[in-house]
Amino acid sequence: MLRTEKEKMAAGELYNSEDQQLLLERKHARQLIRQYNETPEDDAVRTKLLKELLGSVGDQVTILPTFRCDYGYHIHIGDHTFVNFDCVILDVCEVRIGCHCLIAPGVHIYTAGHPLDPIERKSGKEFGKPVTIGDQVWIGGRAVINPGVTIGDNAVIASGSVVTKDVPANTVVGGNPARILKQL
């Protein structure tokens, strides 16, 4: 049975990101994001838009504008999580963010990747790897979380870090690439 490009994308296989269905879904997400980013803070419409855009949203989740993502429906955020402004989540695969997380301004979370081989990359195909962020994680400003990374519970990611590998629970990591600085 042939798989759709969307099914390939969700499975982390090479897929054509210019597929018509995917183009329409990204366009729909951009429309919701634009509305979200332009809606006043005290407006209940913002919560409604967030629930329409994302795969799941826990109780008392705050995402400050501006916020950007590819599709939205791959993003799942737990209760009492705060996402500061200028967050970008490229969600071609699942992104799970736990409960009681703090995400500082300008954090980027990427699930999208491209083939290293230049001929394959020229084809326009890409792939994704999921990102999982545990409970009570604090990600500092301008940190970058790369595809396929899992961050354990209670971890702290220092500002400006580039996280390329899994982060154990109860650790502080920092640098480019991020490395363990301290056990908590």
From Swiss-Prot:
Catalyzes the CoA-dependent transfer of an acetyl group to maltose and other sugars. Acetylates glucose exclusively at the C6 position and maltose at the C6 position of the non-reducing end glucosyl moiety. Is able to acetylate maltooligosaccharides. Homodimer. GO terms for molecular function: maltose O-acetyltransferase activity; O-acyltransferase activity. Its EC number is 2.3.1.79. The active site is at residue 114. It comes from the Bacteria. Keywords: Repeat, Transferase. Gene3D superfamilies: Hexapeptide repeat proteins. SMART domains: Mac (SM01266). PANTHER family: ACETYLTRANSFERASE C18B11.09C-RELATED (PTHR23416:SF23), SIALIC ACID SYNTHASE-RELATED (PTHR23416). Acetyl-CoA binds at residues 84, 141, 159, 164-165, 179, 182. The gene is maa. It catalyses: D-maltose + acetyl-CoA = 1-O-acetylmaltose + CoA. InterPro entries: Hexapep (IPR001451), Hexapep_transf_CS (IPR018357), Hexapeptide_acetyltransf (IPR051159), Mac_dom (IPR024688), Trimer_LpxA-like_sf (IPR011004). Signal peptide: none annotated. The lineage of its organism: Bacteria, Bacillati, Bacillota, Bacilli, Bacillales. The keyword Transcription regulation does not apply. Belongs to the transferase hexapeptide repeat family. This is Probable maltose O-acetyltransferase. The record marks 84 as: Transition state stabilizer.
